[in-house]
């Protein structure tokens, strides 16, 4: 599923942006994750990405380490849930 591959890549780039202190790139990557997550109705992942997007837009990265942890936790929860579903026949 393209969502997971794309979100993993955006997540990796988001982490690089956070480490570099690049607020604009944080906003861009989080925005992409937010939109893709909304498209598949992944509410908690979308909300976590929204918080990161806002931090980037406001150029206030002081809370982003914690926000990124929340995002990763919610994304991992989504992956685990989907892995638990039976495969279609």
Where are these regions (language model features)?
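Amphipathic C-terminal alpha-helical segment
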Residues: 38-47
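Hydrophobic, amphipathic alpha-helical faces that serve as interaction scaffolds
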Residues: 48-57
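A broad "ordered helical/assembly scaffold" signature
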Residues: 34-36, 52
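Long, amphipathic alpha-helical coiled-coil segments characteristic
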Residues: 1-32, 39, 58, 62-87
């Amino acid at each position: 599923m393209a969502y997971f591959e794309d979100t993993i890549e955006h997540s990796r780039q988001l982490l690089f942006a956070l480490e570099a202190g690049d607020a604009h790139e944080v906003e861009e990557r989080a925005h992409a994750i937010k939109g893709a997550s909304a498209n598949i109705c992944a509410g908690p992942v979308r909300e976590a990405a929204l918080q990161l997007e806002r931090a980037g837009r406001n150029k206030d990265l002081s809370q982003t380490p914690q926000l990124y942890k929340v995002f990763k936790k919610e994304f991992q929860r989504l992956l685990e849930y989907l892995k638990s579903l039976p495969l279609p026949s």
